[in-house]
């Protein structure tokens, strides 16, 4: 999970 990254930048969303």
Swiss-Prot record:
Spans traversing the lipid bilayer: none
Predominant location category: secreted
Tissue specificity field: Expressed by venom gland.
Extra remark: Negative results: has no effect on proliferation of the breast cancer cell line MDA-MB231, colon adenocarcinoma cell line LS174, and liver cancer cell line HepG2. Does not induce mortality in mice up to 3.5 ug doses.
Name assigned to this protein: Tetrascorpin-1
Organism: Androctonus australis
A Gene Ontology term for the protein's cellular component: extracellular region
Keywords on record: Calcium channel impairing toxin, Ion channel impairing toxin, Secreted, Toxin
A single MF term (Gene Ontology): calcium channel regulator activity
Compartments, record wording: Secreted
Cited function: Specific inhibitor of store-operated non-voltage-gated calcium channels. Decreases store-operated Ca2+ entry and cytosolic calcium concentration in a dose-dependent manner in U87 cells. Exhibits anti-tumoral activity by inhibiting proliferation of human U87 glioblastoma cells (IC(50)=300 ug/mL). Also exhibits anti-tumoral activity towards human glioblastoma U251 cells, but with lower activity (IC(50) estimated to be more than 500 ug/mL).
